[in-house]
Every structure is written in structure tokens, then in C-alpha cells.
Amino acid sequence: MHDAASGPPERTFTSHVYYGLTKSLCGVCKSAVDAKVQFVDDSVWFDKFCPSHGHQRVIVASSVEWYLDAMSFVAPMTPPRRVTTPVSAGCPFDCGACPSHQQKVFLPVIPITSACNLDCPICYTINKNNGAHQMSTEDLERILGHLVADHDEIDIVNFTGGEPTLHPRLPEFLEMCRAAGIRRLTISTNGLRLRDEAYVRKLAALDARIVLSLDTFRPETDRVLLGANTVKTKLDVLALLEKHDVATTILPAVAMGVNDDEVGALLELVLARPHIRSLELHTMTFTGQGGVGFQRTARITIPDLHRRIEAATGGRIDWRDFVPSPLAHPHCYSICYVLCLDGGGYVPFARLASRATLFELLGDSLYIEPREPLEQVFRDIIDDLWASPDRIPESARVLATIKRLLNDLFPSNRRLSILERQKISERAVKAVYIHSHMDEENFDVARVMKCPVGVPQENGGNIPTCSYNVLYREKDPRFADAGMLHRMTVTRPGARPEPV
């Protein structure tokens, strides 16, 4: 017992700084638990306790500086017009959208099939091939009807699966979306079906955009991530997409110690090919039929990828060239735009204008739109570089490139359509997105409540993608079956196999 006469007891200091509290999930049973946000050295961790499964910790960011900097970017949210479920169990168990959700959907992600021609160890969704689900035309009609009714404009729709190119009516679905007034039609694919040039030609005629999952250039790494060697096939597919001028995004899932050393090579590929519009890096997430059993040493965070990019580019791009998305929670996306200079080379947009300007240009869109605000920013950059030509080494080439772009995008003799401007601007200004998906271990209710990416339902509902993948897809018999759920149970770290 402490003797009061001897003074107060010596204080024992913790090895972390307590920053705040959020709501998360138990990594085993997925029950809601409190998560203390702790700064440990220069990293950010969630510290959780589940009454049934004990103490759990997970890293959520490898840089306190980035974590706090991202939170300094604040933008207003636009709640969804349609609420389909009441608040009952509390977020994230009432999706959706429920009255707690703070952001309308800007990117509807529509899984049109559960069929897939790969069984990837990194797959973070659930897909059954036996008795595979194929979305009907009627179901898509209902979904599109709700999307159009609930939004002033739907700029983009993404088709996913499974493997969406295995749906026999995918071209028809694209035509339906175009008829509904949707401008950007994207297909997330592993690319194997795109070996068929006639099929690529058909998609090109529909002005479809391809989001190609290219994770590595090494066959042995591809087997670790995808369970197959698809590298040559995907590079051949990229050549076909270039031949038919199909706008393409390269989407790698990045795992620490597996393929994170290839981020620079993937960025070089994107910058070198005119038809490749962007690079979207997804952090490895440990949920779904494959990801739940993947080694946890592969967890990587947004600041880790900033460092890989900075190292690969020799500092030509660093973390301060990125900003969060104004549409989402600041810790979900990190976005960098680069101006591709005439004659080769590039300069990050944030070095020509301020990060605040870049954040403002993104506004209420997933992308910088080539509209009048961008025209004014380009003119401001010209004025700034004329006044301070030594501010960046490439001043003369930047001036020449921006002047040409201004003439191409905003000619004095006629007004271009937004689609015409997009095609011009996307070849000159490329984007690097880092998207931090969540699993049951690093789940953050504060993030999911602001999610602008949703899985639309036939009844008009919309479920945020991370909630959908972690909590809801496994309950949907169109995508999940008992065998798949059992495999997920026994491959989870620390799990004990039980009979089906």
C-alpha cells in the first residue's frame, strides 16, 4: 500500500499517445467494439478489446504526420436522398443507407455476377462459381432507375463481379447505362476475357473503360497474389487496349513484402502509355474468401505507399503532392495529379498550384473535371510562372504544355463538350489514387459513414463497399455458399478447423 506521507506515487508513463476513440469491429466475431486511436512512435494504431476474443491491435497508418495532415482537409458532405433502413443496431449494422450515413453515393459499384475464372489468395470479396449468380436485365433496370431518381447526375458506374466479363449481357448492360445518361462506364476485370480482340473491339465501340488488376510483373509474385501466372496475358491485353484506344486504369492490390517494391515500375507504365489514364493502388485488405487467410505481415498503409512512390521517383513525387478526396473520409483516399509535359517528363499538380487548390478542384467529383475552374487555375499557374520562372526547373516546358492545353480544351472558335474535354485532358493529366480498403481488423465507423462508394440494391438501397464486403456479402446467397464460408472460417489466422 502506498504511504501518503511519502508523497504521490511515481507516475508510470505509457509508450503511446492517446488521440481519440472510434468504433470498430472485433477481428474475429465482427461485433462492434470501441477502438482507441493511439500514436506509437510515428505510427497510428487501433487498440481494441472484445469481451469474447480479447485484446487486439492493428496499425492503421505508418505516419502520424500524414494522419493529422489528412484530417486538416475538410469538405461538406451531401447525405443520400433515399433512406431505406432505420437505425436499429447502429452503424455499421443498418446499411443502407440509414439516417446515420453522411454521404450520397458518387461511385455505384454493381456486382453483376458471382462467376470468376480465378481463385485469388488476395480476393477480398466472396464469389461462388457453382450455380453462379448472373444479374438479370430487370434487376439492373431497377437499380438504374433508383440511381437516376435519387441523383441529379450519375457520372460513373463500375461493373464488378466476380469477373464481370463472364456475364453474357455485359455489352447490353453498358448500353443500358449509356441510355440512362451515365458518362463513364467502367469494368473492373482481371483481363483474361480480354484476350479476345473482337470482344475488346466491342467494348471500345461502347466507350467502356477498363480497370485492369495488374499487381506485378513477376510470375512468381503473381502466383502468390492470384494463384496463377497471368502477367504475360495482362501485358498482351494492355497492348490490345492500347491498339483500340480503350481508356484504362491499372489497379494493383499492394501487399507489404510481396509486391510493394514494384509500385515504381507500375507508375512508370502508367506514365508511359497514353491510353492508361490512372494508377489506383489498393492496400491489401484481409477480408473475403482469400484475403481473410493471407499473411498479416502484408498489411500496408497509405503512408507506406507514399514512401514507395517517393523512393521510386527520386522525390519527383512525395506525400505532399497528394490530397484526400473531398467526397470521402480523409483517410480513405490519397490523390495525386501529375501534368505530363510535352516532350516527356511530368510535374505533380500540387507543385504548380497549392494543395488547397487541388482539393478544391476535386470538389464534388471523383476526378478533376475539365471545366471553367480548371481553366482559371491553368491561367493562374501561367501568371505565377511568368512572375517566378525559377520556382520549378521545368518552368518553360510547363508553360508551353499548359498553353497548348488551354487552346485544346477551351478553343476560342467553339465550345467543346465535356466528353471531348475529358479525352484531351486525361492524356495530359494523369492521376495516382491510393485507396485504403477496410477489413474487420482496421474497420473505422467514422470512415464508413462518409463512404461515397456504394453497392446499389434493387430496392433502392445502397451499402458502403467496405461494410458490404466485411458484413453483408457473406449473407447474400447469390454470392456466398456454405462451402465458401467454411473455407473463410478455417483459413482465418488462429482458427481451428471444424467440420462443415
Feature-to-residue mapping (PLM):
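Functionally engaged cysteine thiol sites
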Residues: C50, A89-C98, F106, C116, ...
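Radical SAM/AdoMet-radical enzyme domain recognition
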Residues: E141-N158, H167-M284
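Radical SAM enzyme [4Fe-4S]-AdoMet core and its adjacent flexible, acidic
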Residues: M1, K232, K243-E426
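A short, flexible beta-alpha/helix-coil linker loop
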Residues: I126-N130, F217-E220, F286-T287
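Conserved alpha-helical substructure of the radical SAM core
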Residues: D42-S62, W66, S72-T189, R193-A198
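Broad gene-expression machinery/nucleic-acid interaction feature
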Residues: W45, L107, R209, T249, ...
